[in-house]
Design a protein with these regions (language model features):
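Short loop/turn and low-complexity linker motifs enriched in small/turn-promoting residues
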Residues: 1-189
Length: 189
């Protein structure tokens, strides 16, 4: 997710949304300016950046001086909560019949021949895979037993659910018709 719009004072501007762009240039008089991200959405947070603009030596080729301002943000706790909700929804569907046959469920529960299929613990939290990652993970434990003669008692099956935020072509969080984020949710790696 990136910041595509910002304001300085009463003026709002857009940045080039092309990921291959080397940036967008703006001209400012000398002074200290606060660049404030705008229109970041409900699930993304970004802090303002103060940047001094100095009068000074100019670039030989462009006859201008330049400074770089980087506006960065992060997914917020509200998105993490929505990711947890999506993880719990899939986990709960994986202990229903025929929901357990879904390819997004853990392989161990994808069977039509289970005499026991129970949820011992659903994810209670999710964590982001790393700074800037679009993926959250959570842990679940299922209790399963095959109806074959070999499996004499239920056993626990631990599984990791992966919740990946879907982004639109502009790099923004994709939202459904209710304004909620859209995720790709599945168990496994």
């Amino acid at each position: 997710e990136k910041v595509n719009r910002f304001s300085v004072g009463d003026v709002t501007s857009s940045l080039d949304g092309n990921k291959y762009s080397s940036g967008t240039s703006f001209v400012f008089y000398p002074g200290v300016y606060t660049f404030t991200p705008v229109d970041t959405g409900e699930y993304f947070s970004a802090d303002p950046v103060k940047q001094p603009v100095k009068a000074g030596a100019s670039d030989f080729l462009t006859n201008s001086s330049s400074a770089t301002v980087e506006l960065t943000g992060r997914y917020n706790d509200k998105l993490a909560q929505e990711a947890l909700n999506a993880a719990v929804d899939l986990t709960n569907s994986c202990v229903t019949i025929p929901g357990n046959i879904n390819k997004a469920c853990p392989y161990a529960v994808q069977s039509k021949h289970l005499s026991v299929l129970e949820l011992k613990s659903a994810p209670t939290s999710v964590k982001q895979d790393g700074p800037g990652s679009d993926t959250y993970t959570g842990e679940a434990v299922f209790s399963i037993q095959s109806d074959s003669g070999f499996d004499k008692s239920p056993h626990d099956e631990e599984a990791t659910v992966r919740v990946t935020v879907k982004l639109d072509s502009d790099g923004k969080i994709q939202l459904d018709s209710a304004g909620k984020p859209v995720f790709d949710v599945k168990f496994g790696f």
